[in-house]
Regions:
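A glycine- and small-aliphatic-rich helix-loop capping segment at beta-alpha/alpha-beta transitions
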Residues: 16-23, 118-127, 219-226
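Short acidic/glycine-rich loop or secondary-structure boundary segments that cap or lie
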Residues: 45, 113, 143-144, 209-217, ...
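N-terminal active-site beta-alpha-beta segment that forms phosphate/nucleotide-binding
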Residues: 78-169
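ATP/pyrophosphate-binding catalytic subdomain of soluble kinases
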Residues: 178-256, 260
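General beta-strand structural signal in soluble alpha/beta enzymes
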Residues: 37-38, 61, 103-105, 135, ...
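Conserved small/polar residues in nucleotide/adenosyl-binding loops
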Residues: 403-406
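Ligand-binding beta-strand-loop-alpha-helix segment within the catalytic cores
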Residues: 1-4, 132, 139-207
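Internal alpha/beta core interface subdomains
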Residues: 1-102, 109, 116, 254-260, ...
Length: 406
């Protein structure tokens, strides 16, 4: 393991990115394993004890600090008008419609666009204080404007982000900052919170098949899922009620067939996708590349990130498909075709069927939501580049050189 500090007894301070380091140390030590920790420096007294000394066998002081790269930083300068349109639809057609209070955002430009238009577009809809109050989220730099304008009341983080340390320390009202003045992240607790407590998970994907299964594993790029399979599934053990969870559950078309008279909620699981990427790769496909990847790699299971039966909404630049409202697979496939654009899936769209689905609220286009496409411009971004994010933070955010922009 690597950490920031160790004292002479072997107590470990892991820094802002504690994540699941203590859990790994505990699991190893209590299974007759050996725990070795590389630390940046030895000190007389650690800032706080993240791993107790009796779980540690060896400590090595490194001549240079361990390497940590930014993972969650996205440059606002690279957010397109198309992503802003999708963000507007998501906020008005999902966040606002369901009153989403507790949520997790995946990593990417689509969710960064949402974060950056909360203080502008979200404010114009009068939604501050009504949505997006409690977050299970890494400290995304693109969240700074939303935090500074009172949208995000608290963020509980899986880990930290390079350059955000001083800003986090200055906002103990929002982040999990302890008496030592630093944040203690906890991946294990965040995974549990994201699974059971969150009203909604929303994230980007690379492929969605005709049934609604989603994956970021393609023949051109096998990207990791991160926490998406856990965040992006309905927790059947959940019993606490929130407005968004309860409303979504009561909209499930076949709920009476599944639970009879008993009421049940459902987590909103949203995938955001571009119908055809800038490189010409289709987002909607008849069959996921994951099917062939399973065969090629000799896997027991296709690397599906989110399964169709968990997915409640798809947002593309065409519109939103409310999949949980569909009565059967045929209707679900028609809803997907309606927002699939110029792809092999979208080419099978039946305009008459799409019109029916729009009338029933199963498919919503921007005009159905009262959104003027021409207003989806970068002018809505609360920060248009990295310097703007630094300014919003009062100079406390120190972005990695990889992400600096004019």
């Amino acid at each position: 393991l690597v950490a920031d500090e160790a004292d002479r007894e072997g107590n470990i301070y892991s820094g802002f990115s504690t994540e699941d380091t203590p859990a790994i140390a505990e699991a190893t030590k209590f299974n007759q394993g050996i725990v070795i920790v590389q630390v940046n420096k030895l000190v007389d007294k650690v800032s706080r004890v993240d791993i107790p000394a009796d779980w540690v066998d060896f400590v090595i002081e490194s001549p240079t600090p361990y390497m940590l790269n930014p993972l969650f930083t996205r440059d606002p300068a690279k957010i397109s008008d198309e992503r802003i349109l999708k963000a507007m639809m998501a906020i008005k057609g999902i966040y606002g419609e369901y009153g989403v209070q507790v949520l997790n955002h995946g990593v990417g430009f689509d969710t960064s666009a949402i974060e950056l238009i909360l203080p502008t577009y979200g404010e114009s809809l009068g939604l501050r204080g009504k949505i997006c109050r409690h977050w299970v989220l890494n400290p995304h730099p693109t969240m700074i404007p939303a935090i500074e304008t009172g949208w995000a009341e608290n963020l509980y983080s899986f880990g930290s982000e390079v350059g955000m340390e001083e800003y986090i320390k200055a906002r103990p009202d929002v982040f999990a900052v302890g008496p030592d003045g630093t944040m203690r992240s906890n991946r294990a607790f965040c995974q549990a919170a994201g699974h059971y407590a969150a009203d909604m998970f929303i994230g980007s994907t690379m492929q969605i098949d005709r049934y609604g299964n989603s994956s970021t594993a393609t023949k051109n790029n096998v990207a990791g899922f991160g926490g998406a399979p856990n965040m992006g599934c309905d927790a059947k053990g959940r019993r606490h009620v929130t407005e968004a969870w309860f409303k979504c559950g009561n909209e499930v078309a076949n709920r009476a067939e599944l639970t009879g008279e008993c009421l049940r909620g459902k987590k909103l699981v949203v995938q955001v996708i571009t119908t055809v990427s800038e490189k010409g790769f289709p987002g909607f496909v008849q069959e996921l590349d994951a099917i062939q990847l399973k065969k090629n790699a000799g896997l027991d299971l296709e690397p599906v990130m989110i399964y169709s039966d968990d997915l409640t909404h798809i947002v593309s630049e065409i519109g939103i498909a409310y999949l949980h409202k569909c009565r059967n697979m045929e209707e679900r496939m028609n809803a997907i075709r309606a927002i699939a654009g110029k792809t092999e899936v979208g080419m099978l769209e039946d305009p008459a069927e799409t019109l029916r689905l729009r009338k029933e609220g199963i498919v919503k286009l921007p005009e159905d939501l009262g959104i003027d496409r021409s207003t989806a411009t970068r002018e809505l971004l609360a920060a248009k580049n990295m310097k703007d994010l630094v300014d919003w933070s009062g100079g406390l955010y120190n972005p990695c050189l990889l992400y600096t922009s004019d």
